[in-house]
């Protein structure tokens, strides 16, 4: 599964922090498979990667998420998690909230 996470400008795969969409510096693309992170890559824009992405994780439930849903991407929201490592751990245990209409 591929997961987009909007992050700050740190390129640290474990410690980059999630950012609001209007504050993001780059996108982290996490390849998550069999309960673990296989790889993490960083992109300035989502358009730089043109393959199907399954999920996007947003910083809060007030973010503008409808465009992602219209693209067929499942939208999740963190509770208290901040770093990529914390978010992927919460993803593994289904501890992220699902956004809906």
Residue ranges and their predicted role:
Residues 1-47, 52, 85-101:
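Non-catalytic interface/targeting segments
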Residues 49-81:
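Mid-chain, well-packed structural core segment of small domains
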